[in-house]
Amino acid sequence: MVSELVSMYVPPIVEAAKAVTPWQAAAGVTAAIFIGSYLWHSASLRKQRRTGTADGGLFSLTAGGIKKQDVTKLVDSFSQAYKTEDDGQLTCHHITREQSVEMVNTFYDLITDLYEWAWDTSFHFSCRPRWANFAQAQVLHEWRIANLANIQPGMKVLDVGTGVGNPGRTIASLSGAQVTGVTINAYQVKRALHHTRKAKLEDFYKPVQADFTDTPFEDDTFDAAFAIEATCHAPKLEQVYKEVYRVLKPGAYFALYDGVTKPNFDPKNERHVQLMNATVIGNGCPDMRTWKECEEIGKEVGFKLHMSYDAGEASRVLHPWWEKLDNFINTGFAWYGPASIKLLSKIGFLPRDFTKFIDIAAASVFSVKEAGELGIFTPMYVFVWQKPEKTA
């Protein structure tokens, strides 16, 4: 199945490469080898790569906390974690919860530096106002979820699936709240600490390595919680909802954006299923849920639903959330970005079989964009939950 998904999208990369003239290719390869070799042999860069304190960029890419010799085995195990169900949809339902957690952890080891290089330190989409740039749109997107969670100065707030922490730092800075972010991935904690120290926000934001379905916090600890495109990585959604419910104080709000299929998704439409399969594996999700399933699970856990809607369709004057993916494709970055990484793998700057993972991730650029245009998927369906007040 993985090879089929890759074959759908990789041929255009090959065709684009054929259009490059020999002298352009030779110049590019020579420059890349020279620069790559110079930077690779720089002691300071090697130290930064090892400690997770590099400031991003193509030559700061690593495989996270994975040892170079283990990359091949873990990339293969990541791909093999997925199987096709009877309805044609790709899931990890056949593996144990522990294996699913490990699969997601491996995904973040492999993808974190790529996200920081190609995207930014906020690992999410946003709809851009006409007057704003991408960075401003990201902040606005984060601030909306903070408002929906009713975050106030001095509150203790949980960031559920913090990544490298930029949304948590933004919300802490703007609200005056104390934000604790949890991520399953040790390398992301390193990166979050690096960015937090650099921003001098240690007193406002703290990253913690923990499984968001089994956190180390006491019952009724937090005044609010938020999640941005994170709970779609939970092996079972009810597990993370139950845990957030447990650690929230009575009356507290939990607001989140989640990746879900929309009413237009037709499980009998072969193209729809292909797009969702590429989206699932390309983003390290155990499966793809519908917005209705998310609503039902939250209610079963005990939350009160205050609102749910697709933020991607909230305003007609905003640029679509897949705009940056469109830019990647139109500018050629979706082709020359992966090609550059493959070159670095070829010369030994990155683990050789890291390229297998790049093919999977690159395919999702095209699938996610098309799914957005078809109106069958959104990464920003809003759910605003409240833990009921205790009754006397």
UniProtKB/Swiss-Prot annotation:
It comes from the Eukaryota. The chain crosses the membrane at residues 20-42. Disulfide bonds: none annotated. One of its GO terms (molecular function) is sterol 24-C-methyltransferase activity. It is an enzyme of class 2 (transferase). It is a single-pass membrane protein. Its EC number is 2.1.1.-. CDD domains: AdoMet_MTases. Keywords: Endoplasmic reticulum, Lipid biosynthesis, Lipid metabolism, Membrane, Methyltransferase, Microsome, S-adenosyl-L-methionine, Transferase, Transmembrane, Transmembrane helix. The keyword Lipid biosynthesis applies. InterPro entries: Erg6_SMT_methyltransf, Methyltransf_11, MeTrfase_SMT, SAM-dependent_MTases_sf, Sterol_MeTrfase_C. PROSITE patterns: SAM_MT_ERG6_SMT. GO terms for biological process: methylation; sterol biosynthetic process. It is found in: Microsome membrane. GO terms for cellular component: endoplasmic reticulum; membrane. Its main location: membrane. Gene3D superfamilies: Vaccinia Virus protein VP39. Belongs to the class I-like SAM-binding methyltransferase superfamily. Erg6/SMT family. Unable to convert squalene, botryococcene, cycloartenol, zymosterol or lanosterol to mono-, di-, tri- or tetramethylated derivatives. This is Sterol methyltransferase-like 3. It comes from Botryococcus braunii. The gene is SMT-3.
